């Protein structure tokens, strides 16, 4: 990129006009359904414990904080939105900036736009249907198909992800030429994620969006464990044309279980030599008060716009990608 061109937007003005129209359409979608739009902080004194997420950290040094206060840029508005649910806000959505100190590339930018919404009294399947409705409206695409995580592995890799041991998973990885990574990986979920990324994702969502649901219980994150099969979590992801678009949960409401999961994440972080992260005690305290049974989902807006416009990279649909920020 020449120095004289670096001031220019990464997206064309016509693309930015189309993006604005899509943002307005998303807001109409939720307004028509009586879902409240909210705004929550971009910074917090706590952050995610997930070993696969890397948040940005900053420091507040204003009056009364001469020693400084550690703050984290939010990787998602989830925790604050759940506190609003506990406070009685009802169904809510948010279009906001989120930040992850990770990849930069075709589908990634450290700063990105997230659409996140929560539906009290919705189970996972009802929320999946609403996500499907939104995708059809914005993308004018066919209705989605669905398959379980187990079905996806059996169909494309001929292995049962719920029962296979690490040796069996490494054997499948070898067939995908992934032995250089898999042979030294001891975490079973990381092996599963490796196989899912390289063996399943390229095969799904080609002609229509595809929901993959019932991820292993060990990958529940903030989702409930299924009451029908304790091996799986009430969690889903959505893929279309090679892109992961959304990640949703039938949300965990048990404060003690959530605390234990956060602590387990930090133990995994310590075992990998990663820094342990402060647990969001405000979220735990809110869950103790009682969050309504609900389902929620986070959707990458930049990726959605990218698909709607037929763009090849995120940079084509955001005003200034990080290399021009």
Swiss-Prot record:
Family: Belongs to the class-II aminoacyl-tRNA synthetase family. EpmA subfamily.
Cross-referenced InterPro entries: Aa-tRNA-synt_II (IPR004364), aa-tRNA-synth_II (IPR006195), aa-tRNA-synth_II/BPL/LPL (IPR045864), EpmA (IPR004525), Lys-tRNA-synth_II_C (IPR018149)
Molecular-function GO terms, alphabetical: acid-ammonia (or amide) ligase activity; ATP binding; lysine-tRNA ligase activity; tRNA binding
Species of the source: Escherichia coli (strain ATCC 8739 / DSM 1576 / NBRC 3972 / NCIMB 8545 / WDCM 00012 / Crooks)
An example Gene Ontology CC term for this record: cytosol
Free-text function comment from the UniProt entry: With EpmB is involved in the beta-lysylation step of the post-translational modification of translation elongation factor P (EF-P) on 'Lys-34'. Catalyzes the ATP-dependent activation of (R)-beta-lysine produced by EpmB, forming a lysyl-adenylate, from which the beta-lysyl moiety is then transferred to the epsilon-amino group of EF-P 'Lys-34'.
Protein name from the UniProt record: Elongation factor P--(R)-beta-lysine ligase
EC class (word): ligase
Pfam families: tRNA-synt_2
Reactions this protein catalyses: D-beta-lysine + L-lysyl-[protein] + ATP = N(6)-((3R)-3,6-diaminohexanoyl)-L-lysyl-[protein] + AMP + diphosphate + H(+)
Signal peptide region: none
Example GO biological process: lysyl-tRNA aminoacylation
Binding residue positions for substrate: 76-78, 118, 251
Keywords: ATP-binding, Ligase, Nucleotide-binding
Subunit structure: Homodimer.
Annotated residues for binding of ATP: 100-102, 109, 244-245, 300
The protein's Enzyme Commission number: 6.3.2.-
Domain of life: Bacteria
